[in-house]
Amino acid sequence: MNKMSKNLTALPPWESMLKRIVWKQLGDIRNKKIIDFGSGIGVTADYLGKNNDVIAIEPNEGSVAARWTNNQYMQMIGSVDRLREFADETFDFIICHNVLEYTEDRADIVREFARVLKPHGKISIVKHNRAGRVMQMIVLLNDFEKAHSLLSGNDGMASKYGAIHYYEDADIENWCPELTITQTRGIRTFLDMQQNQEIHKDVGWQEKMIEIEMRVSDMKEYQDIAFFHHLILEKTNKKRAMPPLTKPSIHVKMRETLSERQGQNVKLEDKK
């Protein structure tokens, strides 16, 4: 494994700026026990490892072989199976960036996140935003066919990872009612609109772009068209009530009507 020190200049400019924006949005995290799930080559795990106890989980052995190791963190190879090895309420913070779109068992993964997360612990999820992808297809790639396909609710495609299975921000709360979205921010609202690739390399331009991206990231009208959403979720102590799975039986409805007619405050009891 290459133990040479690496920094963000080793990444393409768009990826370097994406990391910096996400890290700024995360704020200063210290002295926390963290999982980075789907850690890739470990750029974020390495960054957080400087001041935290970090465990990175990644299924791709090639990515693990190329991982960044400037700072100390524990690397595990695997997926949701590795999450199941941890006891309940073990971690303070979970990182999951651009991962759930590429999995079929994402609801199970999110529920495992909640299980291993301490009460009031937080999860950082970066996810694709369908509207932003439509913008990309039309403005940058001139691909109207794919834009129409996305607007019709179909999946997208990433050259490196395959099908992008889009989901809505609120789906996460539906998969696991213990989790509540406390913050939503946009990412890459303007960054990719600049098609002059040479200017992307200009450090001064990068700083100005990051500044304006951060400024609009909390504004809903810009979040709506951002390429990505950055969600912060918190584990609550109280589970929210789930909607009923079936409609009330005809017998219950009849008894409710009878109770109303008699003007009585009758407590209904379902009979099997």
Describe each region flagged by the PLM.
Residues M1-K32, V43-Y47, S63-A66, S124-L150, Q195:
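Conserved class I S-adenosyl-L-methionine
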Residues I41-R82:
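Class I SAM-dependent methyltransferase SAM/SAH-binding core
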Residues F93-D105:
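A short SAM/SAH-binding and catalytic strip from SAM-dependent methyltransferases
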Residues A107-K122:
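A short glycine-rich, Lys/Arg-flanked "PGG" loop and its adjoining helix->strand segment in the class I
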Residues Y161-L179, T184:
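Short alpha-helix
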